[in-house]
Regions:
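Auxiliary, metal-adjacent structural segments of Zn-dependent hydrolase domains
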Residues: 8-58, 128
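A short, surface-exposed helix-loop junction/capping segment
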Residues: 1-10, 89, 95
Length: 169
């Protein structure tokens, strides 16, 4: 509804400040410039956030759905879950903007071993999809970095073909 949209749009300055503050901290830690990447907000119902690297016609940006991160929605994310979401997307930024050691490039995919390695550096939950409370759990990154993805809903790439998910929940 338009009332909710207006309330959520009024929150964007707060979210922007929260995200930039976190990304500036991570940038200092890693020598990167993620806090300078444009941040946009929308009303996506099927994704919480995204990082677009900026190839071809795509502009580099972070994008977050106010329907998930907003304070005035029915079931807002906790601060810990919001921070984990922001780190999740920053880990995608890291994949494109820093050298990943070869030993962490064995598993292809958007949430493959390189992304998991980036998660391990910043304390993001190495889970491809949002799960409430994942950001609070102490993750065994060594184990996660060596484990193949077994979730059949995640696209996997092999040398001969591309397998896409057949069902989405």
């Amino acid at each position: 509804d338009n009332n909710l949209r207006q309330l959520l749009e009024n929150e964007t300055k707060i979210h922007l400040a929260e995200i930039r503050f976190l990304y500036q901290k991570l940038d200092r830690q890693l020598g990167l410039n993620g806090a300078r990447v444009p941040i946009t907000f929308g009303f996506d119902t099927d994704r919480l956030g995204a990082y677009t690297p900026g190839f071809g016609q795509d502009e580099e940006e972070f994008h977050f759905s106010l329907l998930f991160i907003g304070y005035c929605v029915t079931k807002p994310l906790s601060k810990d879950d919001r921070m984990d979401l922001y780190k999740h997307e920053y880990a995608h930024y890291m994949q494109y903007n820093m050298d990943i050691p070869d030993k962490y490039n064995w598993q292809p995919g958007i949430h493959g071993s390189a992304w998991k390695y980036c998660c391990s550096l910043i304390g993001a939950a190495p889970t491809p999809y949002y799960k409430a409370g994942e950001g609070l759990i102490k993750h065994d990154y060594d184990k996660v970095l060596k484990k193949k993805i077994t979730d059949k809903s995640i696209p996997t790439v092999s040398y001969t073909h591309l397998t896409l998910p057949t069902n989405r929940e």
